[in-house]
UniProtKB/Swiss-Prot annotation:
This is Paxillin. It comes from Rattus norvegicus. Residues 291-310 are annotated as: Required for binding to PARVA and ILK. It comes from the Eukaryota. A motif (LD motif 1) lies at residues 3-15.
Length: 586
């Protein structure tokens, strides 16, 4: 009722200056329309039905004037209206329509050439007066309206509001004399929004919105419905005629104010100013491309939220801040799903996301026997979106290639880096093939393999050179046969006399200072070799002149007599007896 009170206040403020403006009340004949001379003409004979309009006329390219619809030979005579009925209309010169039957401008342009045409009240010319005459006083109308509104408040529910900005088109099935066929009288009037929404559309008739056919409704929605048909006013009126309805009172009050109303021109195919119409039909006509575009916009929004979430990871959220991007994304997905369902777009879920356990609509990733949202199929370690990159599975969790190799791939013992391709397993360790080489010379191992010492791998040559036993003669590694003597290993070819390099016969040798010698060189090294015969002294020996001699080999160098008495003379490292020394040197 607050809306009705506001309506009455608006009506009072609007009609406060009505006393300064004329109010025209006229009586409506059953087959008449206003002309430029402000008189009524009545059709003499019902004309034949005109042919259907051409396709050009329907498309709004050809404007048929109203005169073309008049049959030839029709004559109209002035007739007294049988009963008073107020008619209010307004038109402009520029009003035009594509079809005379569904146009407001055609009817108004045919009415006359004035800028604004108002119907003047005709005096009662009939012999018999009307049973009831409606009062033209504005006060009586207002009091009647107040009484009706009180009754309406007691009986019916209060309406939701009065849409003063909307325009309804009221069609009357009374035939118009000037058209020559059954037409519709078009009256512009405000209407209640609830009543308009509850009224059903009229099939096959003019569209309730500005006389456009319903099949060609440019707004794609359901416009305001037609108001109730006005009954034909004959000579007598009943109780219902005496008590006008709320709609008729509103029409009278609205049209009593001579405020110019601009004509509404509707061309079939375009509309000069689109009206706001809310309808479920408009929503159900959305195309599949529109739904796809909404999904693309949603994916772009998801990417923006992802970047926002990554940028805000390091910073703490202020107290009382906004909700998390995850909840906003869930809200967006839920609202999109409900909106698509309301619009009639079937969104069949392509599966349930393995991460968020929610249905998937749009792009889907299939991996590891599950379906995922693209933004939820991320690396378990770094939480980066995997997308179309390669990934590895570990314990049912996806990992990107970098993190998987970093976490689970074997490490090279040499460089400690992850092994991505080929691997060499040796010494209970793993190696890159290019990092498994000799620890001494750096050469790669050939078919002969490698040798291990102290956890390191060596080639054959370096291993024996470094760790194999060395020969006592040549100091080289002994690889095959060897001779063990003097606490040393010897190559067989290296175990010989260290002086004459003669192999030992029957394996017997003499040792001096840790080296093997033959008998001769052994005694020579030791000084036990007879200086006279150059043979080893195995028994008694005489030591003279820092030399050793067999007793029988120590003789005079001139007479060769044995010097057994123990006296001799030495001259030039040679022993002489005393008589020979005197003879030779004295």
């Amino acid at each position: 009722m607050d809306d009705l009170d506001a309506l009455l206040a608006d009506l009072e403020s609007t009609t406060s200056h009505i006393s300064k403006r004329p109010v025209f009340l006229s009586e409506e004949p059953p087959y008449s329309y206003p002309t430029g001379n402000h008189t009524y003409q009545e059709i003499a004979v019902p004309p034949p039905v005109p042919p259907p309009p051409s396709s050009e006329a329907l498309n709004g390219t050809v404007l048929d004037p109203l005169d073309q619809w008049q049959p030839s030979g029709s004559r109209y005579a002035h007739q007294q209206p049988p009963s008073p009925s107020p008619i209010y209309s307004s038109s402009t010169k520029n009003s035009s329509a594509s079809n005379p039957q569904d146009s407001v401008g055609s009817l108004c342009s045919r009415a006359g050439e004035e800028e604004h045409v108002y119907s003047f009240p005709n005096k009662q010319k009939s012999a018999e007066p009307s049973p009831t005459v409606m009062s033209s006083s504005l006060g009586s109308n207002l009091s009647e309206l107040d009484r009706l509104l009180l009754e309406l408040n007691a009986v019916q529910r209060s309406p939701s509001g009065f849409s003063a900005g909307m325009v309804s088109v009221q069609a009357s099935r009374e035939p118009l004399g000037s058209w020559g066929t059954e037409g519709r009288a078009i009256i512009l009037s405000p209407f209640f929004q609830d009543e308009a929404e509850s009224s059903p559309p009229l099939p096959g008739a003019l569209s309730p919105l500005y006389g456009v056919p319903e099949s060609n409704n440019l707004l794609g929605g359901k416009a305001g419905p037609l108001m109730k048909e006005k009954p034909k006013r004959n000579g007598g009126r009943g109780l219902e005629d005496v008590r006008p309805s709320v709609e008729s009172l509103l029409d009278e009050l609205e049209n009593s104010v001579p405020s110019p109303v601009p004509a509404i021109t509707v061309n079939q195919g375009e509309m000069s100013s689109p009206q706001r119409v809310t309808s479920s039909q408009q929503q159900t006509r959305i195309s599949a491309s529109s739904a796809t575009r909404e999904l693309d916009e949603l994916m772009a929004s998801l990417s923006d939220f992802k970047f926002m979430a990554q940028g805000k990871t390091g910073s703490s959220s202020p107290p009382g801040g906004l909700s998390k991007p995850g909840s906003q994304l869930d809200s967006m997905l839920g609202s999109l799903q409900s909106d698509l369902n309301k619009l009639g777009v079937a969104t069949v879920a392509k599966g349930v996301c393995g991460a968020c356990k929610k249905p998937i609509a749009g792009q889907v990733v299939t991996a590891m026997g599950k379906t995922w949202h693209p933004e939820h199929f991320v690396c378990t370690h770094c939480q980066e979106e995997i997308g179309s990159r390669n990934f590895f599975e570990r314990d049912g969790q996806p990992y990107c290639e970098k993190d998987y190799h970093s976490l689970f791939s074997p490490r090279c013992y040499y460089c400690n880096g992850p092994i991505l391709d080929k691997v060499v397993t040796a010494l209970d360790r793993t190696w890159h093939p290019e990092h498994f080489f000799c620890a001494q010379c750096g050469a790669f191992f050939g078919p002969e393999g490698f040798h291990e010492k102290d956890g390191k791998a060596y080639c054959r040559k370096d291993y024996f050179d470094m760790f194999a036993p060395k020969c006592g003669g040549c100091a080289r590694a002994i690889l095959e046969n060897y001779i063990s003597a003097l606490n040393t290993l010897w190559h067989p070819e290296c175990f010989v006399c260290r002086e004459c390099f003669t192999p030992f016969v029957n394996g017997s040798f003499f040792e001096h200072d840790g080296q093997p010698y033959c008998e001769v060189h052994y005694h020579e090294r030791r000084g036990s070799l007879c200086s006279g015969c150059q043979k080893p002294i195995t028994g008694r020996c005489i030591t003279a002149m820092a030399k050793k001699f067999h007793p029988e080999h120590f003789v005079c160098a001139f007479c060769l007599k044995q010097l057994n008495k123990g006296t001799f003379k030495e001259q030039n490292d040679k022993p002489y007896c005393q008589s020979c020394f005197l003879k030779l040197f004295c």
